[in-house]
Amino acid sequence: MGRVGVLLLNLGGPERLEDVRPFLFNLFSDPEIIRLPIKGLQKPLAWLISTLRASKSQENYRQIGGGSPLLKITEAQATALQQRLKEMGREVSVYIGMRYWNPFTEEAIERIKRDHIKKLVILPLYPQFSISTSGSSFRVLEEMWQQDPYLRLTEYTLIPSWYDHPTYLSAMADLIARELEQCPNPDQVHIFFSAHGVPQSYVEEAGDPYQRQIEECTRAIMRTLNRPNQYTLAYQSRVGPVEWLKPYTEDALKELGEQGIKHLLVVPISFVSEHIETLQEIDIEYREVAEEAGIEHFQRVPALNTHPMFIESLSQLVVKSLEEKPTTFEQITHPKANMKMYPQERWEWGMTTAAEVWNGRLAMIGFLAIIIELITGQGPLHFVGLL
């Protein structure tokens, strides 16, 4: 088989306040995050949004110590995984590839090539698949494989999602159970699953399986937990005026407060590491929302980080993938004839040349409107909070 490697994929995060703006630029330059009809507008718009959002985002990172802990945690996960695989008799080198910040996926691939890895397991640290997370990283990797003759000789296999893996579910249930045991009336605590949201159109138009996998994962965790607690699933981190998956976390918290819920245990279901969405958005912003809604006790389950059962689940996934038939990019990109993985492959802006021309004109008008709004400081985007 030759030398074996595991590539862990994740989002990445700014480690210093001065990294925030370029990180946001990389994020909003991704067509899986913001899709435009004219590719030439992608980076100018990313520059505008990152410039306008940098100050607020820096303040959020300042509240959690001045930077994201994501890389350090991912490095610890990689070390623990490599050690566990060694204990299982597998000599494997583990690499980290971040989508929007250092170390970038491209850097990881260069290290993999230098180490002469002959077989690579590509493992996203996203339990549930989405075109905006695992899908975006897969797109980058697929392009690299197509363009690099050396990589085309490297055997690889993908692990698209693992939200239903029994050991992962046990790790999540264990974290929840530990928090419940600290409560005076554990069976009366309302369990609140908060997942990162995606635009509704990803699910309805592009066929993204993310919502289905999140819902199935939530039910599976509750079955594994095997407790009588009531629970709610909601979606956080909405950006912009478009419809995202509902219910929104903020709205769901207010509704639970109106129902008289007093003790809430929040479970970050789509995050395996502590980062800005858990440490600032949940712990600070949503805590304030809950308290204002009348919820008196607000607890959060910690992220999995290097939980032994979580590392065990990753090692089991790697070993299983090495023993099975490889899963390729083509299998993920084209799961069925009428559905593509990437939204720019699936969504069409017009059926005729004339329609496409009008789409371009409308895009330019919209772009000019943004410029005018930036100059005046007033307009609909300021009203909805996007700018």
Swiss-Prot record:
Specify where it is mainly localized. Answer: cytoplasm
Q: Summarize where Fe cation binds, as residue positions.
A: H196, E277
Q: Please name the PROSITE patterns in this protein's record.
A: FERROCHELATASE
Entry keyword set: Cytoplasm, Heme biosynthesis, Iron, Lyase, Metal-binding, Porphyrin biosynthesis
CDD domains under this entry? Ferrochelatase_C, Ferrochelatase_N
Determine if Chloroplast is one of this entry's keywords.
no
Record localization: Cytoplasm
Give the EC number(s) listed in the UniProt record.
Answer: 4.98.1.1
Name the source's superkingdom: Bacteria
**Which InterPro entries does the UniProt record give?**
Ferrochelatase, Ferrochelatase_AS, Ferrochelatase_C, Ferrochelatase_N
Pathway it works in: Porphyrin-containing compound metabolism; protoheme biosynthesis; protoheme from protoporphyrin-IX: step 1/1
Q: Which family does it belong to?
A: Belongs to the ferrochelatase family.
Functional description taken from the UniProt entry: Catalyzes the ferrous insertion into protoporphyrin IX.
List the NCBIfam families hit by this protein, alphabetically: hemH
This protein is called: Ferrochelatase
Organism in which the protein naturally occurs: Microcystis aeruginosa (strain NIES-843 / IAM M-2473)
